[in-house]
């Protein structure tokens, strides 16, 4: 029997849900044995494909796919400079695919290789939004009827109307918050506008309404999306204390991370942090100094399952729980990777989940099953998910930059998305 080795690495781009996705397929010299991994960096999808096809593939071909740690370590430093989001996503796609292969070789789901089941199902949180407090409440009630016990509550997206129409923003903000945003009447620069001051004043009103109407029997999450100043984030966290959030997500930007210490000193609102981090070492001082309660981690952007499991274990030792990023711009393969980590991590906190349409489930057979706000992965060897490449070709990627990243404040200043 010939020694197992990698014979081909390719990138599959597809958008069956209307969002550009990148999936890596690592093939071996054993007939029918291959692995899949998520390398989705939607905002730079073609750059990731180039990184995989032109750099990762030549690096990997001929190597033993079972040497996951060695491949991860050597690939991570092969470009000398490291931990950029493009190469990390490329590395993630490969890393997940190697875990998929190893699970298939062992005849076990990946969660068994990571230590085995810690729970029967995976509690999920879903997203709710609305133009005003009543609309948000109605949408939460609909999710509660579906069985969800955790919901993320936003009003007008992240402090705006998700549009470049300033009049519409003013109308929605005035309707929802009785606040008139300060906006420039001239030379409107194209972009997605929001008002951070109006937003910060509206959020406590939203949660006051929701707790008055829905009580404390459901868990609420709110995402600041790093869109306010550090001082405003501290004020917001303090003001939200009476409403007992499950957590407040990304209250400050990575560039302002030192402010978390002051926030922690002044507020008991639980904090989740790290959606924009690209290196597991970025969480270390936050975990060591007890500045966060949840690791908010985009698994593909830090390099895949291998570093994510290490981060989860380090967090466990320090009383911090997991909250892997689960938006619509990760592939179902990435969703499964998150959930295998969830199943095997005793310090699991919560899993974000974005519903999948029929096209996604057809292109990716083996997607997790959702029942009453819980997710269940199958027990097939590996990650338990596949891809129909013929169907995937019917949903080409456009490679454009998503409009929501073009954020501006009412005076036209470019801002963090």
Swiss-Prot record:
Keyword Metal-binding in annotation: yes
Positions bearing the site annotation: Important for activity and substrate specificity: 327
Molecular function terms from GO: gluconate dehydratase activity; magnesium ion binding; mannonate dehydratase activity
Pfam families linked to this entry: MR_MLE_C, MR_MLE_N
Family from the record: Belongs to the mandelate racemase/muconate lactonizing enzyme family. GalD subfamily.
Organism, scientific name: Musicola paradisiaca (strain Ech703) (Dickeya paradisiaca)
Binding of substrate, residues: 127, 275, 296, 325, 329, 352
Record InterPro entries: DgoD-like, Enolase-like_C_sf, Enolase-like_N, Enolase_C-like, Mandel_Rmase/mucon_lact_enz_CS, Mandelate_racemase_C, Mandelate_racemase_N_dom
Name by which UniProt lists this protein: D-galactonate dehydratase family member Dd703_0947
EC number in record: 4.2.1.-, 4.2.1.39, 4.2.1.8
Required co-factors: Mg(2+)
């Amino acid at each position: 029997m010939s020694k197992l080795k990698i014979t081909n690495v390719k990138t599959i781009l597809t958008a069956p849900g209307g969002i550009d996705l990148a999936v890596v397929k690592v093939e071996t010299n054993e007939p029918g044995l291959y692995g899949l991994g998520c390398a989705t960096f939607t905002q730079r999808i073609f750059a990731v494909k180039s990184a995989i096809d032109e750099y990762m593939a030549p690096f990997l071909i001929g190597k033993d796919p079972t040497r996951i740690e060695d491949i991860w370590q050597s690939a991570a430093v092969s470009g000398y400079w490291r931990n950029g989001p493009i190469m990390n996503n490329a590395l993630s796609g490969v890393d997940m695919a190697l875990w998929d292969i190893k699970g298939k070789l062992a005849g076990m789901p990946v969660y068994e290789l990571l230590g085995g089941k810690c729970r029967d199902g995976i509690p999920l949180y879903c997203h709710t939004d609305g133009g005003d407090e009543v609309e948000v409440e109605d949408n939460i009630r609909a999710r509660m009827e579906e069985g969800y016990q955790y919901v993320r509550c936003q009003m007008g997206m992240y402090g705006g109307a998700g549009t470049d129409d300033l009049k519409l923003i003013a109308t929605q903000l005035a309707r929802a918050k009785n606040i008139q945003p300060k906006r420039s009447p001239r030379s409107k620069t194209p972009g997605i506008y929001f008002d951070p001051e109006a937003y910060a004043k509206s959020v406590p009103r939203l949660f006051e309404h929701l707790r008055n109407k829905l009580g404390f029997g459901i868990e609420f999450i709110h995402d600041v999306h790093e869109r306010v100043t550090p001082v405003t984030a501290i004020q917001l966290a303090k003001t939200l204390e009476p409403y007992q959030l499950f957590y407040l997500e990304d209250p400050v930007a990575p560039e302002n991370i030192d402010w978390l210490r002051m926030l922690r000193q002044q507020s008991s609102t639980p904090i989740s942090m790290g959606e924009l981090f690209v290196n597991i070492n970025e969480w270390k001082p936050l975990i060591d100094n007890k500045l966060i309660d949840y690791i908010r981690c985009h698994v593909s952007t830090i390099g895949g399952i291998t570093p994510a499991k290490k981060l989860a274990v380090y967090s466990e030792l320090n009383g911090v729980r997991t909250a892997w990023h689960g938006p619509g711009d990760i592939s179902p393969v990435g969703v499964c990777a998150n959930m295998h980590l969830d199943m095997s991590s005793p310090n699991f906190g919560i899993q974000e989940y974005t519903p999948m349409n029929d096209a996604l489930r057809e292109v990716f057979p083996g997607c997790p099953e959702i029942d009453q706000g819980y997710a269940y992965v199958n027990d097939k060897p590996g990650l338990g998910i596949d891809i129909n490449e013929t169907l995937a070709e019917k949903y080409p990627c456009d490679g454009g930059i998503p409009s929501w990243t073009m954020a501006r404040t009412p005076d036209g200043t470019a801002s963090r998305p």
